[in-house]
Amino acid sequence: MSRDSLFVAGFVDISTCPKEDPSLNLDAQTWSRYLPLSTSIPLTVEHFSEAQVGWVTGLFSVAQGLFCTAVITAGEFLELLDSLYLECTVAQHSPKADLPRNPRAEVLHSWLPELSLSSVHPDLLGTKDEPGQVFHHISLCALGRRRGTVAVYGDSLAWVLSRFQSLSRDDVAMIATNALTPPSQAPEFTVKLGLLFAKAIDAGFISNRISTLKLDRQAAGISPATYLKASAVPQKLETAAPLNQPEGADTLIDSTMSGPGAPPAPQDDLIPVPRSAFLNMLESTVSRTHPANGDAPALLPFGRYNMVQVPKGLTPYVRPVGFIEPSDQDDYRYPSYTGPRPYDYFAPRQLCRNCCTSRPRKRAREDPEDEVSFPGEESTVFRKDLTDLSKSLAELQSEIRELKQMQNTPRPYPRPEHHYPAFDPLMYGLRPLPNPDKFPKEFICSDYFTKDESASKKPEVVHIPNPEQHVPACAAQPEVKLVEEKDVAPKQPRVVNASFQPKAETSKAATLQKLFCDEMLSKQ
């Protein structure tokens, strides 16, 4: 193992992988004219010219694409890798394969796992503006723009080339034979560490970086027996010893328990949710949930029986065993019809979301624009929401119990009956036709409308004053009788109408008749 160098190799372009930018396409026939390299080109970090860490010893055109080899010889950079290994948890994560520990290779696989080629734009090739040097440099980076450009680090070139299963034996032999010897000149690693830290921070916010590295590793055909950390997960080096539990005690703790006595959930299982959103989800869940032991389904109203159900009144009557009836009766009984009860027309009770279970919605919290959050730091707004949720947990549980009690309230169903009620034609939307034989022959009016008037109205007596002749009291009695007979004589019905007025002719005739009677009585 050499302490002064570290070898690296990998694809800088795979022809079968699609490119997002057309300028990233490398035509094998066009670029093969500038290969192989006549001299070594710089190997840098994140395309910083002052961050040169070694030399590129070869660029080779193979069946899959463009392959490169390089060597890291900068002493300052190698010392930086040794110091980073002592503080990096991911780098100290042991590889899955049975490989010896290599701190420098493990740090580079965790920090700079891919390669990036810097070359002339394809549009300038073959023109008068084509520069003399087509390939500028190759950089170690956190994630390349071309897919499949995964780097493999090792202590020897032969070991590094053996990790690529996509290379044939002829390609491996050709690369090992034609690789250049690095220059004896030491590379200039004078970059400020702040620039490297800034790039490392930016790499932490690349979307889907880990999954992309896994796909690039598969595209390059790299063997699992490498130090690549694309699928590594940070683990704690020290674990707390388990507490002593008595025999028979359950040592498993469910992290999803909730309540005052529940253990705290792990940090990875906590999802910050605003209070308004949590209440809305809880409300919709409770409204859709029906009690386990619900009431029986409601009875169907009249006129909604299907072909499977038996209509009321058409079920055969079964006589009880040992019961002797006084007379033979029909097999089918139709008890006396009783009017429908009020609850027969009630629809099935349903929970109204608008007026029963819905709670007054609170105004959703607006995200403050001036809220500043840093990577790895929990947001203040989410922390406040979690605190409020923990304080109001008892209130939410009480509300859930009240909603369940409302749903479990029994419905006022009628008591079961032993016999079906009588057949009701209205149940099928039919009305019984009247029997013409039972129609009355002549119109008979009831005294319902006139009994009050006849009881309250007294016989009307009209007295005609006669100053010339005195009428005795005994002689006035027939006059009253005549008036009563006149009023009672007609058999026609009388209807009290509030807007009706007596006819004037009737009053005049009664007056003349009375005058005639007075004349007859006076002559006797």
UniProtKB/Swiss-Prot annotation:
One of its GO terms (molecular function) is serine-type endopeptidase activity. Belongs to the herpesviridae capsid scaffolding protein family. The keyword Lipid metabolism does not apply. The record marks A230, S231, A498, S499 as: Cleavage. A motif (Nuclear localization signal) lies at residues 359-365. This is Capsid scaffolding protein. Residues 359-378 are annotated as: Disordered. It comes from the Viruses. It comes from Alcelaphine herpesvirus 1 (strain C500) (AlHV-1). InterPro entries: Herpes_virus_sf, Peptidase_S21. Residues 504-524 are annotated as: Interaction with major capsid protein. Keywords: Host cytoplasm, Host nucleus, Hydrolase, Phosphoprotein, Protease, Serine protease, Viral capsid assembly, Viral release from host cell. One of its GO terms (cellular component) is host cell cytoplasm.
